[in-house]
Amino acid sequence: MAEDAKQYALDMHKQWQGKIEVVGRAPITTPEELAVAYTPGVAEPCLKIQENVDDSYTYTRRGNLVAVVTDGSAVLGLGNIGPEAGMPVMEGKCALFKTFADVDAFPLCIRSNDVDEIVRTVQLLAGSFGGVNLEDISAPLCFEIGKRLKEVCDIPVFHDDQHGTAVVTCAALINACRLTGRELADIKVVFSGAGAAGISIARLMKRMGVKDIIICDRKGAIYEGRDGLNPVKEEVATWTNQNKVAGSLAEAVKGADVFVGVSAPGALTQDMVRTMAADSIIFACANPVPEIMPDEALAAGAAVAATGRSDFPNQINNVLAFPGIFRGALDVRASDINDDMMEAAAYAIAGLVDDEHRSAEYVIPGAFDQRVAPAVAEAVAKAARESGVARL
């Protein structure tokens, strides 16, 4: 970001003094209104909720409220900057929830990197919320935190860095395959990056029918038996790279139909793209500098190029997913956001790009396409009902 843009961002945040605020819904302008909204009238809904805790969704705002939870350990590209320093991002996330899907959200920035403490904190607060969005928590802690919270909370828990990224990337993949005449079951996908996002994208792709997946970390292709794998990567090796391809990213990407980058600038070269299948699909999502620039990928033979940036076509932007996903989950009071719901969200996003308009520069809707959140919410709510996690 240019220095003048950085200063402008600072100036605006100083002017705003926060991007969200609490606004009252009940009129309190007379003694009578005060008596209804607070004492003594407030006792009646309290007693109802005491009789049936689920009535907290009826008599309070809980059913539209999401906790945006971070420990500040993996904030954007800034790293472990701490919970307070992560607050501007969490406020921004809350603002996006409200703007795109009318979901109320509140930041919870926790002063701990301990899994037990984070899980216990969120578990104890879960009764105040209708859902939990985990944000900017480093891998591999985020996997354990998400898994355990799903076990102990009766409200949906969603890690956007994993699951939101996976949904949007898979939506783009659906249309890129349609554009290039490919079937998901027939493609070879190679990943650069074995963190939370990469593994989650690969997992959703596998669920959607992709069979040939290779994930590369800094040491090259991951496969069963490779030295230096942590427990998360050991598990990943059981369902990826069944042919045990070894070697660097350059070796793994040969003949691949799709490259997915969630790693570092410059990780993919034009020479690597030239070794891929004809009309390859390149998703270079490192920010702010992608693994390869779109024009370079296209010049090397790619048919479709997408990035995480708004100044290029085909932006892989999580705002296409998380507002609508939570809107749909909250609308049916879902107890979980499961794989069925995420797959439904991906197909809903992809479906907004029809055959007539689909092109190399348009395989995913834009961030401000007002059709997206309602379409995603409807698909997610339907999938929640069909998979048995809806409570309405």
Model regions and ranges:
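Rossmann-like adenosine-cofactor binding region
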Residues: E234-A303, R309-D311
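Short, ordered loop/turn segments at secondary-structure junctions
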Residues: D71-S73, I81, I110-R111, D136-A139, ...
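Glycine-rich phosphate/diphosphate-binding loop of Rossmann-like nucleotide-binding domains
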Residues: L76, I81-A101, H159, H163, ...
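N-terminal ligand-binding/catalytic initiation module
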Residues: M1-V157, A377, A383, S387, ...
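General beta-strand structural signal in soluble alpha/beta enzymes
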Residues: P107, N133-D136, V157-D160, F191, ...
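Adenosine-phosphate binding glycine-rich loop
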Residues: D160-D161, A284-L392
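Solvent-exposed alpha-helices and their adjacent loops that cap or buttress functional pockets
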Residues: K14, Y57-R62, K98-T99, L124-A126, ...
